[in-house]
Every structure is written in structure tokens, then in C-alpha cells.
């Protein structure tokens, strides 16, 4: 049993690639195939695989590496230029699902599809629908070759800002319900994170440039290791101390590395790791975690 995880990984890697190729034939991203592989092998399907601590931690590392690589592949100047457009897209991406989700929840409750006791619960359901999956967005853009384009940067900026705005909205609703942190505390943490990310990212960027300049390229390989250390530390601090998703910290670390002369070289070291192992495990793990127990027909109709 100690080595059962090896067979689990083999099944995940094989199924995600096969179903990824299949979905690609139908003009869909391969990430859809990876999600379907998890559904098929998990409790919602054949029940061959179940979520384990090993798979959970490996999948979490997978999404961190995915966002770190996305940050390293981002044109920082283009991202700055796309910031305003990304903000308005993100703002609409929160407001529209929030209003429509709240209205649909109220209507679904009225006809008996779901049960909600008051308007606040309907608003909470609407708030949940504001969430986006930045990781799926990144993987799809990478597969399409659009991640480093103006459109890709706008979409990515919008997705990241949407995550932050969604967190603020969720905190506000939780505060109205009498639980969770205060909205002021959450806003201070978010501002604190961006200050932290800016200072640490700038310092790390200067350090990498100094090492390359002083050692005539000798430190290139070591910079790859230090870059990953930076990614892990920023991802941890984002989640632990600032209440921001770890993937946001990883992406910020990637942006810092992208500004160095060897940013593209360092990124090339992590792309194979993500493609061969970590990214497939992450997306398959999403499907494996899906369980239909306790989901009523009305809730299923509402979800669709």
C-alpha cells in the first residue's frame, strides 16, 4: 500500500493525456480532458481514485507552479497597459454574476428548486458565482498561445483582479451575516500584500541581476532554484498572513523573475515540470474531488 500512489499517478497522467487529446479533436482545450479524467476516475465516476493527502498537496503545488510559470511568461509592460481594461472587465465580472446569481437564487427558491431562508442567503449564492478559476484561464491561454498577447494579458489581469474583488464581496456578505473578518481588515490585508509583493519582488529582482552581473552567468542555475524559493515563500505568505490566494503570491513572484535578464531561461526550467506531472495532477484532482452525494435535482438544474 505504501507505493499505491505510484499507480495513482500513472492512471492520472495516462487518462489526462488521452482525454486531453480527445477533447482537442472536438476543438476544446485539453484542460477539459484533464477535468473529465478526474471525474471519470473519481467518486463521481468509476471510483477508482479518491483524494489523498499526497494528491491534495501535489495538486496544490501544481497550481502554484502553473501560476509562477504564467507570471514569468507575462510581458510586464503589456500587463501594465492592460490594467485599466482588466479592472473594468473584472468589475463587471463580479457585479453581473452577483446580481444575476442573486436573482436566480431568489427565483429558484420561489419555485422550489433550492431552499434559502432569506435574501442574504440568496446574495451569498450570488457571491459564490463571482468566483473565477484563474488556473483554468491560464492553462487555456497557454494552450492557445495567447498568454503573452494583449488580449491574454487583459484576460489574466481581469481574472486576478476578479479574485480580489470576489474576496472583498464574500467578506462583506459574511460580515453582514455576523461572521468572518471585518471588511476594513480584509482591505488592509490586501493592500498590505501588494506592498509586500512589490518590496520583496523588487529586492529579489535586484538580487538576481546582481548575481548574474557579478558572477558572469555562473549563477544562472542557482537563480532557477532561488526563483522557486521566492515563489514558495511568496505563495505561503500570501495565504498565511494576508488572506490572499497562494496562486496570487506565486504569480507575483513570477512577475519579479520575468523582469530579470534570465527570466525566459528560468521559465523554461519549470515548464516541463508542470506539463509532465504537476499540472495534470492538479486538474485531475479537481474532478476527483467532485461528489454528487446530497445534490438534489433542483440544485443540479439551478447549477446548470
Predicted regions and their residues:
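Entry/N-cap segments of selected transmembrane alpha helices
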Residues: 4-20, 75-110, 181-200, 290-304
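Small-residue-rich segments of transmembrane alpha-helices in multi-pass membrane proteins
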Residues: 34-43, 89-103, 157-171, 219-236, ...
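N-terminal transmembrane signal-anchor/hairpin module of polytopic inner-membrane proteins
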Residues: 1-41, 45, 49
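Core mid-bundle transmembrane helix pairs that form the ion/substrate translocation pathway
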Residues: 9-10, 17-18, 164-265, 272-277, ...
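Structural signature of hydrophobic alpha-helical transmembrane segments
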Residues: 1-12, 51-69, 117-133, 187-199, ...
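Interfacial helix-loop-helix linkers and transmembrane-helix boundary segments
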Residues: 23-28, 48-57, 73-89, 113-116, ...
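Short helical (or helix-break) motifs at transmembrane helix termini and adjacent helical loops
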Residues: 66, 70-74, 100, 125-169
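Hydrophobic transmembrane alpha-helices of secondary-active transporters
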Residues: 37-41, 56-82, 174-178, 247-260, ...
